[in-house]
Amino acid sequence: MGRFLTTTALALLATGGAATARPIRACDVSTKYLITFGDSYSQTGFDVTGTKPSASNPLGNPPLPGWTASGGLNWVGFLVSEFNTSTTLSYNFAYGGATTNATIVPPYQPTVLSFIDQVAQFSGSIARKPDYAPWNADNALFGVWIGVNDVGNVWWDPNYDSLLEQIMESYFGQLQILYDAGARNFVLLSVPPIQRTPAVLLNNSPENQKAEALAVDKYNEALAANLEAFTDKNGGITAKIVDTGVPFNTALDNPTDYGAPDATCYNSDGKSCLWFNDYHPGIEINRLVAQAVADAWKGSFF
């Protein structure tokens, strides 16, 4: 049986170098790997066929802070550049607009890579543990933060509960693929309170905001229940859920403490407001999310 822990972290929780005599391998005994999947809340614009991550360039391509939707570093960038205690290399397959399974919840464009597509990219690249990414069960942490678009796109659907069951089946089908490839450490990030985004507050009635909040809660409850079943089924797993509602609400309830005039303004500099735009968190919320993940794995990965 695997070990399943739920963590609410704050409260309880590119360049290619000159040719060398031999290939540079990220195989120092202390090197760790952060292998992530998700949507625009996690994307850094990484292309696994491009420049590979290294100690001096942990995102690989593009270099820090990457191509993010935060105005600067997002939670992935913070983890590998500020919260790491040793060299931690990011292989980030997240893709903006992603849903878990595009046949269940279509993304905003058909070209968007779903969680299924992202895992397929992993399977076709670093799953085989190549010389440039010799990860193993002990030194690799697999992170998944997806569901914002799944919930956001169908919370209103009268068949939401049925769709949620299908989403979870697909989600944990992908985790099974990762497990079968050798993944044993998993951190799953919950869907944050998207009903508090400026977009939802400005464009939805109070009743609809409450309905979307309920849909978020249902998603996160299903995530926890399915993770417990997944760890019961598969041996040797250490899995933790980070409740992203804690860092989000910490900032949104105290905006001036984080350099913002209020909880609803947004600015593409990622700093003047808590929001980068009307749906994506800025730098400070991303820092808090990263801190939450680091706290959950303190003493092992961070």
Swiss-Prot record:
Residues modified by glycosylation: N84, N101
Key word Signal present: yes
InterPro entries in UniProt: GDSL, GDSL_lipolytic_enzyme, SGNH_hydro_sf
Signal sequence range: 1-21
GO molecular function: acetylesterase activity
Gene Ontology CC: extracellular region
EC number: 3.1.1.6
Keywords for this protein: Glycoprotein, Hydrolase, Secreted, Signal
Principal localisation: secreted
Uppermost EC category: hydrolase
Cellular compartments annotated: Secreted
Catalytic activity field: an acetyl ester + H2O = an aliphatic alcohol + acetate + H(+)
Function of the molecule: Acetyl esterase that acts as an exo-deacetylase. Liberates acetic acid from xylo-oligomers.
Family, similarity comment: Belongs to the carbohydrate esterase CE16 family.
Protein name: Acetylesterase
